Amino acid sequence: MSLRMLLSTLRRHSLMPILVALQVALACAILSNVLFMVQQQLAPMLAPSGIAGDELILIDQMTPRQHPWSAADVRRGEQALRQVPGVRDASAAFGLPMVSGALMDMALQGGNGAKVGVNGYLGAGLVKTLGLQLVAGRDFLPEEYRDFGMGGVGNAPWDAGAPQPVIITRALAEQLFDDGQALGKVLTDPGDADDHGYRVVGIVRHLLRNQLSLAIDGRSDNTVLLARRIGSTSLLSFAVRVDPPISEATRTRVAEAIKREFGPTMKADVIPRISSYAERRANAFKSHRAALWLFAVVTVTVVVVTVIGIMGLTGFWVQKRTRQIGIRRALGARRAHILRYFLIENALVAGSGAVLGMLLAVLGNRLLMRHYELAHLPWRYLPLGALLMLVLGQLAVLGPALRAAAVPPVAATRS
């Protein structure tokens, strides 16, 4: 049968095709947005951290009772932790993966003019403590560090006119420079009027940012290490690298060292949080896993309802046209012809529904952006959702189409 005759048949019996197309359109709109939201939840979970996660104990929520801790207090704390049996290294830090209490965000601009939002980590010896892999350049030299005081108190000034040394990730280097060659180059902060720039002295393979909500669309490694050691501070965090696997005895000794060094000057009603990186990661992604389960239920429900709906409507349509199918068989149509006819017919109906569904997906995404701060739906999810609906439509119509192909020519003589 020609395409013109097929379209003519659809126009004469338009109710069933319209119902199928509307069902496909609604399912396509839902699936396109759900697939996008699944990717948003999965992206930070699948992003490589770049650190020795199975060897890290993270300590935060440390606040002083009265006056801020001095740089000397922080140095004594680091030394006390390094002397704990089983501890390989320890660094006081401002900003760590899976630690959201201390957050530094900034914008960097490189050779290609692009402004890239990044998270900054500060602390002496973080490359070694976190177990980062340098792929180019070097670690900071001891004489390059300057004290960083919270609120600007105790900040050591940088050399006049000299750019600060920084270590960035390989992904960030590729965003800031078209050729990815950032080593030795100077970056700028467009939002800082007194900025003298940042000279890249090293590049690490990966380092996960601590703003997990932004760790999507290739931005999970938008992280920079600054040559600053923790000075005067009223909010203290430590990264402690221990011999694997992390034992309860080592964790207890680390907690005792913190209590011994900072207990007398620490707020009694604020208990420091001491846990492994794996525990922090599990807690940080708890809401992501719950969302993924919800999206899985929605996806399965939409798929099942769509398939059942198409099968039911198409089956009813086949039943109504049994005599017409029998006439075609009597006129010489083979089973393969009947099967192909229904598959093509379904592809046309589902295809038109998918086109409408892509438009509905965009409109639905606009509503979600307005009311729930969802990101803009990338265009690639539109054809993906449409393709899924076309495949589902073909699978759903296969059963009724096979039954139609099995109709004998004698059915044309039945009333």
Briefly describe each language-model feature range.
Residues 35, 298-325, 395-396, 400:
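A hydrophobic alpha-helix feature that marks transmembrane segments and, especially
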Residues 302, 323-369, 384, 388, ...:
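Transmembrane alpha-helical interface segments in multi-pass membrane proteins
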Residues 2-3, 385-415:
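C-terminal membrane-exit region of the final transmembrane helix in multipass inner-membrane proteins
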Residues 4-11, 15, 308-349, 406-415:
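Intracellular coupling helices
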Residues 78-79, 83-84, 163-164, 170, ...:
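"Rare, low-scoring activations can occur
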Residues 1, 8, 12, 16, ...:
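Membrane-helix entry/capping segments
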Residues 13-40:
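Short, strongly hydrophobic transmembrane alpha-helices
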Residues 35-172, 192-196:
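Structured, solvent-exposed hinge/loop segments at the ends of secondary-structure elements
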